[in-house]
Amino acid sequence: MSNRTFQRGDPIGHAFADPALLARALRHRSAGTPHNERLEFLGDGIVNLLIAEALYQRWPKADEGALTRARAELVREGALAVIGRTLNLGERLTLGPGELKSGGHRRDSILADAVEAIVAAIYLDCGFERCRAVVLPWFEASLAALPVGKAEKDPKTRLQEWLQARQLPLPTYALISESGDEHAKQFHVACILEQPVARAEGQGTSRRLAEQQAATLVIAQLDSNT
């Protein structure tokens, strides 16, 4: 599966002066070098800056905690993967045979990485101002959907605050297993409470995502017992 040049009217919203940047941004490491991991690294920083700036301007009364939680929600893997699908990146990725066979073009982690790489490619192609103008509209619906200044706290934070409010021991997160190739990891984690006694297991493409899922399930257990 290989990339095609973005045509006028394509959802990405940018015509590359240097098509090689686009090609590299869409080339997964499974397809060999050069691949998009360095662009992904740069794009991660740019996306965080763009979203931080947008939230800072839109939420003048929000405190640091609310801004941080909102940014985390907008740049998480699942949210970026949704953008990747909206931009039709999956069908344009250059993948190795193994990833093609396993449906890598549909995997959240690969799509999220590709979005970050595309952001970096746009930045290198035309500079920060143009990059902001192209990329922020991708996030507009998600930005508008956030309750102003009151971003939903992630499950781990909510669980911790619930326990602290009752002066109970904080949860323990234990790694049960880690599997998969380096670019397609799967983590299996348990969230364990001493008091009240509770345990749940979560899985995800990163340890953080697995812990969040496990915390969500523990919260559901606590809610059902109250």
Swiss-Prot record:
Q: Which GO terms describe its cellular component?
A: cytoplasm
Give the superkingdom in one word: Bacteria
Any keyword Magnesium? yes
UniProt key word Membrane: no
Q: Which GO terms describe its biological process?
A: mRNA processing; regulation of gene expression; rRNA processing; tRNA processing
Q: Pfam families recorded for this chain?
A: dsrm, Ribonucleas_3_3
Catalytic activity line of the entry? Endonucleolytic cleavage to 5'-phosphomonoester
- The protein's Enzyme Commission number: 3.1.26.3
Q: Which residues form the RNase III domain?
A: 5-127
Q: Boundaries of each DRBM domain copy?
A: 154-224
As cofactor, the record names: Mg(2+)
Question: What quaternary arrangement does the UniProt entry report?
Answer: Homodimer.
Function of this protein?
A: Digests double-stranded RNA. Involved in the processing of primary rRNA transcript to yield the immediate precursors to the large and small rRNAs (23S and 16S). Processes some mRNAs, and tRNAs when they are encoded in the rRNA operon. Processes pre-crRNA and tracrRNA of type II CRISPR loci if present in the organism.
Record protein name field: Ribonuclease 3
* Annotated gene: rnc
